[in-house]
């Protein structure tokens, strides 16, 4: 059976992965693919990288960048009309200037890149300048409505399609909080705004995350291979009007009264999960590189 994207669905579907073989398979299963998101952890899980590490071999810093570039160029060629998110290296000490330097280089790799910066103070500084230079950006590791407001303020004046914000659902669920409430809250926050920031639902762990994000009207959803394969296997169902998201024991995350008119530096954007996510991504990146060759900071 050949599947096609329902004309009733406005949400774009991205694959969250670092293996072009998965890209090819998901395109075949769905009959379409609107884009792809990558990050250091996903690149470290690429079969070629895992084989190399399994042999006790590591990369030089330039080799790992060349490998990452090769992966995203292959993916870009498969979805030339879609977006491919490419993530800079960022740990707790990485400056905006370093992120921006990396971002400029990565943006030149492919014609359809969105550069991922963390939703941290330095990440927002980098994104603010990147947008002014005409780059497309994706603010990742977002866990709160306040952080999303800061993304909006830092990128004010950008064109629609130039800025994504990626709230992470599953990692909030892991803390016992209803991560889908954060998606709903951010979508509601932006409803009366100018539309220059698009909501990209990320850290999707199950089919209900996917279905509820579609129901909420998320601009984009990125999901791993297994979940998109499961969705395709069921015929790519859309949530019915009677659909109810199974909250279970997750605690609600109430909406807040937040103005989008303030300078971005006035928002309290600190979040422990953002810090933890940066630590995890940077550790996975460093694990690919021989100790004596680590230079990124």
Descriptions of predicted regions:
Residues 1-9:
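Active-site-proximal helix-loop elements at catalytic-domain edges
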Residues 9-13, 17-25, 29-33, 38-132:
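Active-site beta->alpha loop and helix N-cap motifs at the rims of alpha/beta catalytic domains
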Residues 20, 62-65, 69, 100, ...:
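Electropositive phosphate-/nucleotide-binding environments in soluble metabolic enzymes
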Residues 50-57, 61-65, 154-157, 181-189, ...:
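Ligand-binding grooves and catalytic loops that recognize ribose/phosphate and carbohydrate rings
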Residues 73-80, 108, 153-157, 188-192, ...:
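Generic secondary-structure signature for well-ordered alpha-helical cores
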Residues 115, 213, 281:
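A residue-level signal for conserved active-site and pocket-lining positions in enzyme catalytic cores
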Residues 121, 127, 136-255:
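Catalytic alpha/beta core domains of metabolic enzymes, predominantly
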Residues 254-297:
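C-terminal extensions of enzymes
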């Amino acid at each position: 059976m050949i599947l096609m994207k329902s004309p009733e669905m406005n949400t774009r579907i991205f694959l969250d992965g670092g293996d072009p073989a998965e890209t090819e398979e998901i395109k075949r299963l769905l009959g379409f693919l609107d884009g792809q998101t990558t990050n250091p952890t996903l690149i470290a899980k690429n079969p070629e990288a895992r084989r190399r590490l399994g042999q006790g071999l590591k990369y030089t810093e330039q080799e790992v960048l060349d490998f990452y570039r090769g992966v995203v160029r292959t993916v870009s060629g498969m979805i030339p009309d879609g977006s491919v998110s490419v993530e800079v290296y960022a740990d707790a000490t990485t400056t905006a200037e370093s992120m921006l330097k990396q971002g400029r280089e990565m943006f030149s790799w492919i014609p359809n890149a969105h550069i991922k910066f963390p939703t941290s103070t330095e990440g927002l500084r980098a994104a603010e300048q990147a947008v002014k230079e005409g780059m497309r950006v994706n603010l990742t590791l977002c866990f709160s409505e306040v952080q999303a407001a800061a993304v909006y303020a830092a990128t004010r004046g950008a064109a629609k399609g130039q800025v994504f914000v990626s709230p992470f659902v599953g990692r909030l669920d892991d803390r016992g909080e209803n991560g889908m409430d954060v998606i709903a809250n951010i979508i509601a926050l932006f409803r009366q705004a100018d539309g220059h920031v698009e909501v990209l639902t990320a850290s999707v762990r199950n089919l209900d995350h996917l279905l509820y994000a579609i129901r909420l009207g998320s601009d984009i959803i990125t999901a791993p291979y297994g979940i998109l394969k499961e969705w395709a296997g069921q015929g790519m169902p859309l949530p019915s009007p009677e659909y109810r998201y199974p909250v279970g024991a997750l605690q609600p995350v109430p909406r807040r009264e937040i103005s989008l008119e303030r300078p971005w530096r006035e928002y309290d954007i600190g979040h422990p999960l953002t810090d933890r996510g940066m630590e995890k991504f940077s550790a996975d990146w460093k694990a690919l590189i021989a100790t004596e060759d680590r230079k990124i900071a």
